[in-house]
Amino acid sequence: MSVRLVLAKGREKSLLRRHPWVFSGAVARMEGKASLGETIDIVDHQGKWLARGAYSPASQIRARVWTFDPSESIDIAFFTRRLQQAQKWRDWLAQKDGLDSYRLIAGESDGLPGITIDRFGNFLVLQLLSAGAEYQRAALISALQTLYPECAIYDRSDVAVRKKEGMELTQGPITGELPPALLPIEEHGMKLLVDIQHGHKTGYYLDQRDSRLATRRYVENKRVLNCFSYTGGFAVSALMGGCSQVVSVDTSHEALDIARQNVELNKLDLSKAEFVRDDVFKLLRTYRDRGEKFDVIVMDPPKFVENKSQLMGACRGYKDINMLAIQLLNEGGILLTFSCSGLMTSDLFQKIIADAAIDAGRDVQFIEQFRQAADHPVIATYPEGLYLKGFACRVM
């Protein structure tokens, strides 16, 4: 008999709406013992079967749902089916947009909670972010090897969130050759170098692909400031869009060096690109105090908020940095501003920008809205999957 997680009375509603998480407060009791990440059945207070998921005794998310089908076992065949379903959409997208790199698995939205897989050419980069994902590591890798025999698999599960579920951080090759120090990929006509082994996340922010392309419409003959530039994807796109100058700012010398290489790789005019290693908050104030002006500013900061207790502080940070950006823009200038914090809703982010404009003493028009690229889908029953949001704003 399987181990069962029994919900408290009235706490089954979210599962009936097919939300994939069970929080600790919804649990009445466990029937049987389960190890970290083990597959369990989830039932209501009367014993009616609801879902099958992975158990995580130390996490606020006590279980993550693998399936709502009582006949479905969680095995190699299960992961093979999920991967094949996800690949159909990515195949179409890759053909339409000419991509050689994309997000293959976007966690809960692809029916595989806690699992992220990015494909860069013939390298699959894996992140296992939950206890259930780690427990099923062998089955998942077996399915990947069968479906993608041409691909090497590299583990980038070196993320702090694993500690919340009692797991060690892991990184390194799983199968096949080691990725090169810098792997070239193609995106909307750009060639970009990706550091799979040491870069942020899985090596590159694929989710901003369409936003980088959209930048080109605003930059012709304009002076552009690219904040939190990382390896320069927005800078390369701005140069391809015909900007007169782009200044890229980041705290990482290594990231800026790759950004410079990306400009050269695309045979763009390096004299139009400036690379500044500095703290963005500090530099924006310096620019303001000495009267610097820009026509377009890209503001793509790292995540400011990890949990609800940090939300108010994050709001202040977003407001401050966008206020400074608005002050630096010429009349009619464009601010392209983003938040990758899942707890930051689009409505709240828009309000923060509006408040920043008021504090800056400028009027702002919202002219375009952004979200993560189409290979990062959001399943309707899991709205938390929409984590990246952005706006193009015209400053009056």
Swiss-Prot record:
It catalyses: cytidine(1962) in 23S rRNA + S-adenosyl-L-methionine = 5-methylcytidine(1962) in 23S rRNA + S-adenosyl-L-homocysteine + H(+). Its main location: cytoplasm. Keywords: Cytoplasm, Methyltransferase, RNA-binding, rRNA processing, S-adenosyl-L-methionine, Transferase. GO terms for molecular function: RNA binding; rRNA (cytosine) methyltransferase activity. It is an enzyme of class 2 (transferase). Residues 2-81 form the PUA domain. It is found in: Cytoplasm. Its EC number is 2.1.1.191. It comes from the Bacteria. PROSITE patterns: PUA (PS50890). Specifically methylates the cytosine at position 1962 (m5C1962) of 23S rRNA. NCBIfam families: PRK15128.1. Belongs to the methyltransferase superfamily. RlmI family. This is Ribosomal RNA large subunit methyltransferase I. It comes from Escherichia coli O1:K1 / APEC.
